[in-house]
């Protein structure tokens, strides 16, 4: 007999107030039609959004084990729509139009629908204005969850139409302890997982994914090899990294294709097109998330190199690759490690601006190679 699954809301143990508030809202039938989750990166806003979506769509308030809950947990439920900005300057009008066209359509599997809008501060006035009426009076059974860093950088007209939920900043130690409790793994490894994945919930998922851990290993090896690498080696490493990052997407794509096949006979052509567009967005978002996770692996590694240059006994995040950290520290100096960190930051900005992932990785690796040799 398979073990009972825990709901995503119950797993939000680093944001107890948020967890209890949302759990009570669902249990008492008082869930708002529009939420605005506010907090610093890494506070767990996106994890909470998926958790709330799971509870809202479940007929048992988020049991964690029914078909709907499992699909939401795997990010494959066709009635949960996740949006992230598709241009360097923010959300496109076409994205807003697509969302508004989808809102009146009936749900595909559940009795309700959820729209998660990440980095909502990047909703520009011309795109946000189109959302206002729908945010204020959405159809019954539709929930919006917007994610942002601060109400101060959001359009006031958006903030006023949402129920704001503040998230406190979670310390790395507390986050690592939460992951260790959930997985039973060594606290040092859990600390690394949180640093790379970005939050406790995603850290737990990272430690369960051999493919995501392999992508991290590939990034560490790529940087470790840069001192002696020629141009062909760098390009080959970048290509291998992209392949590793995309590896977890195969299962997602297969699941999406099965859902399309199951619904092909009774959905209209327009509804199928909406589902195909949603699947494409989901794959793009997952690829971007994987790239950012790989870049976080590079960032934490080079940060550890910089700390080691300043103090050989420094407390590093990547304890399992301390030998690599030592080799890189021996090959460069503080200026070189700092330049390498700047190269990673540039790559992260480029990915946020929708630069081609392989190009962003190639440029970063060449820049890190140059930085490491500046000694």
Model-found features: residue ranges?
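Charged, glycine-rich active-site and insertion segments that engage polyanionic ligands
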Residues: 1-54, 68-71, 140-142, 149-297, ...
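Structural recognition of the conserved hydrophobic beta-strand(s) that form the central parallel beta-sheet
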Residues: 115-118, 131, 142-148
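Clamp-loader machinery-focused feature within the broader ASCE/P-loop NTPase space
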Residues: 1-126, 133-136
